[in-house]
């Protein structure tokens, strides 16, 4: 079975970012299905009835708009910029993932699909997909690396509780990239009833654009909310980056405002200068994988290197093509945060604000801890909390040597 990193057909026009990132590098077996998805997205994204249906689910099911919360204690403790937290952790299912899943599931419904498949790393995208499949009466199958099923057992059970079948992926490094491979292989199998709900801003066009479109609600809201609270734009927007869906959603409404600094925070793991890292933009090089041209952790022969992070949601060996372009153009800055720094931030935000945030989000919080004291008191940071940290409590306790009964 061919996967999307085996280039058999490509488009030099579709979904390009910057000089040459993005595109469609896919096997022939997927081109027809991808064309159907592209047409449906382009036809429906601005359709008033589709937009009304999407908005109704976002408001009445997903609990939007999410709060823009002034982190008073953190602001006072760090002694610099005012810190606002965009609370995606308060969405139904506990993360930003639901925004994109609702949109793609509605596309699937309009295409007459009966079955949703998806990859997941930390499990949040899988939970969101299983949730919407249950709501819409669709079958659901989730592919998750065996390493991740072992460290996110609670989310595995949650998906099964919602009616999904979870497939532990035992190939490769048994992490997110391998889950993506397995899902792509399943999607390439002959079937007219299946829709692939891709969870991050990666893959062949139109997925990066589509995910950005559905996740841009994060920054559309935060821009309006901060205007109401402070009557100004933020000076900086900070979000964690794996594949990059929460970050591109957090950045989208500000990309054309050059006064707003955009900072994506990658997982440096044991250190960006070690081989136990997932700092793709800092360490990666241009390549083709999972249907797109972007930056990847790879060797001289173009083979994908293993990556590592304490965070199951950030240990992807690539990054979305728009992030690669934003980095190349200097419009956004990308920094690395280590496991130790993220774990410290997990404790810090809990004690300062009474919020147990996802370990993915705590990479962004750790950077805010560093940068806020260097900024003026009249400056403002918006930091996106991509999800809640219930799923991480046991693993963080284990990391710190605390014995807890899961």
Curated annotation (Swiss-Prot):
Q: Catalysed reaction per UniProt? A: (1S,2R)-1-C-(indol-3-yl)glycerol 3-phosphate + L-serine = D-glyceraldehyde 3-phosphate + L-tryptophan + H2O
Listed pathway(s) = Amino-acid biosynthesis; L-tryptophan biosynthesis; L-tryptophan from chorismate: step 5/5
Signal peptide boundaries: none
Residues recorded with modification N6-(pyridoxal phosphate)lysine = 97
Q: Listed GO molecular functions?
A: tryptophan synthase activity
Any one GO CC term of the record: cytoplasm
| Database matches in Gene3D superfamilies | 3.40.50.1100
Q: Does the keyword Translocase apply?
A: no
Family matches, as PROSITE patterns: TRP_SYNTHASE_BETA (PS00168)
Q: What is its EC number?
A: 4.2.1.20
Transmembrane annotation, as ranges: none
Q: Which UniProt keywords apply?
A: Amino-acid biosynthesis, Aromatic amino acid biosynthesis, Lyase, Pyridoxal phosphate, Tryptophan biosynthesis
| Recorded superkingdom | Bacteria
List the Pfam families hit by this protein, alphabetically. PALP (PF00291)
Q: Does the keyword Amino-acid biosynthesis apply?
A: yes
The cofactor(s) it depends on are: pyridoxal 5'-phosphate
Q: Which NCBIfam families match?
A: trpB (TIGR00263)
HAMAP family, sorted: Trp_synth_beta
What does the record note on quaternary structure?
Tetramer of two alpha and two beta chains.
Family membership, please give it. Belongs to the TrpB family.
Q: Which PANTHER family match?
A: TRYPTOPHAN SYNTHASE, TRYPTOPHAN SYNTHASE-RELATED
Question: What is this protein for, i.e. what is its function?
Answer: The beta subunit is responsible for the synthesis of L-tryptophan from indole and L-serine.
Name assigned to this protein: Tryptophan synthase beta chain
Native species of this protein? Lacticaseibacillus casei (Lactobacillus casei)
């Amino acid at each position: 079975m061919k996967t999307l990193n085996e280039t058999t057909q490509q488009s030099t026009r579709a979904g390009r970012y910057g000089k040459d990132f993005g595109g469609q590098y896919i096997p022939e077996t997927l081109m027809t299905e991808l064309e159907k998805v592209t047409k449906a997205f382009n036809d429906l994204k601005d359709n008033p009835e589709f937009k009304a249906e999407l908005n109704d689910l976002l408001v009445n099911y997903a609990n939007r708009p999410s709060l823009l919360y002034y982190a008073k204690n953190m602001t006072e403790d760090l002694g610099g910029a005012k810190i606002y937290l965009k609370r995606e952790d308060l969405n139904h299912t506990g993360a930003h993932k639901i925004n994109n899943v609702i949109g793609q599931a509605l596309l699937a419904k309009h295409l007459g699909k009966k079955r949703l498949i998806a990859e997941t790393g930390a499990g949040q995208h899988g939970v969101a997909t299983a949730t919407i499949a249950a709501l819409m009466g669709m079958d659901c199958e989730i592919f998750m690396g065996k390493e991740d099923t072992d460290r996110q057992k609670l989310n595995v059970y949650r998906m099964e509780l919602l009616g999904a079948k979870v497939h532990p992926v035992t190939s490769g490094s048994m992490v997110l990239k391998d889950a993506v491979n397995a899902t792509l292989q399943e999607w390439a199998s002959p079937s007219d009833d299946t829709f692939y709900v891709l969870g991050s801003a990666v893959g062949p066009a139109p997925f990066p654009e589509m995910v950005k479109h559905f996740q841009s609600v994060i920054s559309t809201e935060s821009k309006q909310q901060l205007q109401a609270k402070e009557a100004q734009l933020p000076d900086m927007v900070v979000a964690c980056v794996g594949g990059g869906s929460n970050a591109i959603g957090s950045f989208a409404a500000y990309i054309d405002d050059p006064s707003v600094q955009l900072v994506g925070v990658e997982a440096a793991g044991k250190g960006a200068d070690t081989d136990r890292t997932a700092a793709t933009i800092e360490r990666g090089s241009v390549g083709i994988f999972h249907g797109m041209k972007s930056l990847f952790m790879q060797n001289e022969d173009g083979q994908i290197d293993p990556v590592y992070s304490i965070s199951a949601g950030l240990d992807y060996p690539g990054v979305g093509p728009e992030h690669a372009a934003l980095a190349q153009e200097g419009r956004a800055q990308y920094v690395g945060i280590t496991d130790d720094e993220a774990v410290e931030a997990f404790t810090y935000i809990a004690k300062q604000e009474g919020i147990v945030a996802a370990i993915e989000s705590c990479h962004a919080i750790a950077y805010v801890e560093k940068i806020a004291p260097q900024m003026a008191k009249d400056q403002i940071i918006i930091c996106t909390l991509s999800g809640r940290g219930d799923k991480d409590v046991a693993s963080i306790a284990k990391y710190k040597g605390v014995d807890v009964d899961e």
